[in-house]
């Protein structure tokens, strides 16, 4: 049986900063939780706690509905710095 991959323990940066509310219009803060294809990154990679991961998912979904962040990017249009044009 294959062994499970071990990940380094990460700590929630939102808990350390004592964040209680996140705004969907703050696209710059969302970039740490999105991949280069604008997918929501999992908790094991970002180190977020469950509470903040759920909050981030809700905020990203609201930003997508408001057309501030694209839903997905096709393979041909992936860019190396996806948030350069969102500033």
From Swiss-Prot:
The keyword Repeat does not apply. Keywords: Ribonucleoprotein, Ribosomal protein, RNA-binding, rRNA-binding. It comes from the Bacteria. One of its GO terms (biological process) is translation. One of its GO terms (molecular function) is small ribosomal subunit rRNA binding. InterPro entries: Ribosomal_bS18 (IPR001648), Ribosomal_bS18_sf (IPR036870). The keyword Transferase does not apply. Part of the 30S ribosomal subunit. Forms a tight heterodimer with protein bS6. Belongs to the bacterial ribosomal protein bS18 family. This is Small ribosomal subunit protein bS18.
